[in-house]
Structure formats: C-alpha cells, structure tokens
C-alpha cells in the first residue's frame, strides 16, 4: 500500500514540514510514499525552494501554477498528480501536524473511505473560526452534510474516491462537495491543532464568500429552491396585503393610504427580485464558463528529479 501526501507551502516553513512528513512516513514501514508540493503562485520564493527539494529527492514532485487559482484548484492538481492507494491532503500553514497522519491512515484501514481531522481546540483567528462555523452550517443545509461530521483541510482518502473526484472538470472545484458526492462513509479523527508558524490566514471575507458561492452553486440547486420559496411567500404576502388594503378601503373610506408603506413594499419586493435574478445569473454564468471549458488551473512546470536526470542523460547521448 502506498501513502501519498501533498500540500502547498510557504517558503519559510516548507523545510520543516517536509522533514516532518519524511520522518513520519519512514516510520510507517508498510507504506511507501511520495510528496507532491503545489505552489499556487506564492508571492515569495516558494517554488525555488520546493524545486530544490524536488531535485534532491526523487520522492518529491514540485508543481508550479501560472497564477493563483485557489486552494481547491491546487488540491485538484495534487490529486491528479498522485498515484497512491491513499492520498493525504494538508493545509499550508503548519497548523496541521503531519506526524499524526497515522491516525487518519488507521481510520481508512478500519473501513472508512475518507477520514477528516477534527480539532478539539482550533487555533485559528476569530474571523477564520467564524468562517468555518458558517461554512459548516451552510454545508449542512446546501450539501446535506451530516451534522455530526466535521470537515477540514486535513484529510485522507482512498484511491477510488480520488479517481471519482478528479473526473470533475468544471471550472469551479469544491473539494468538500466532491467528497460528499462520492461517499457517505466518512469519519472524523481527533487531531491536535498547532499555532500558525508564519504569517496570517490568506482567507479574507471576499475569498470565503467566493468559496461558499463556488460550492453551493456547483453542487446544489437548493439556493434556487430557496429563492422559489421566498418568491412564493412574497407573492402570498403581497396578495394578502392587497386584500387588507381593499377591505380597509371599504371599512375605512376616509383613511388616506400611506405612501411610505407603499414605497417600503416596493423596495422590499424589488430587492427580492434582484436577489433572485442575481442568483439565477450566477448559475447561468457558471454554466457559460463551464461550456467554454475555462480551466481549473494552468500548470507552468512540474519538476521531478527523475525527469531532470533523464533529460541530462538524453543530452549526453
């Protein structure tokens, strides 16, 4: 059985993380492994560092994107490059302990298709924790995620799940949605959460909103159904209010109908209509982009020691 681990990194933390992965995987003697490092166009010299690591170790593959495509596109690139029976995905901030990967592997050996790390005490910022909470709740509503299941960026999955995930070619990948679509045999494993080694989380409110929109419009039609329900409720409310106005006109003929209430109603229903049109437009726009085959990511280069060795050998001959 092969254990495969990949992640994207910061140049300041990569050396220690790779060393930790090596040490842990070498202690698990029944596994062979490879490390796939995906550079999602980091602003520092990350790719120079991981390129050097790849040239020194045949077990390491370095992937460099042309531009920033986002975490989920980077994960898809790593999944497609992997070849093992098991794939373990880690985040890039040093907070996910690679030395506890054996806990995830054990869960898969016990029959699970996917094992997600669950943190008893998360050491993210208050904003990141709030974003994670909202993401959990929205996934429960939109993607039918079980309430007892905690999803995180640190997880292990079996090969047949990976094979199903990488068949997804639409422009907006959402890994959680792909996992939930593929299997319900998912478990949580308690893992310690570390303090962030360098910098701050790259997730801003804009990125979180974009991630939620990607996931829920790509893997669920529930937003459209919710919009339909709101439309029906609004129409009924408007109809009832119209009846009330007619009754008041006959019961209280001297009463002057207020312009303010009419304006408020128009603004409310106008806002509802614009929201629904925007939601429909989002779906139509994504269909259009997918039909144009907009790529999930563009790889600038892939570096492997064996490939470089073969090229040098060809030049010598």
Language-model regions: role of each:
Residues 1-2, 34:
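Cell-envelope/extracellular polymer assembly enzymes that use nucleotide-activated donors
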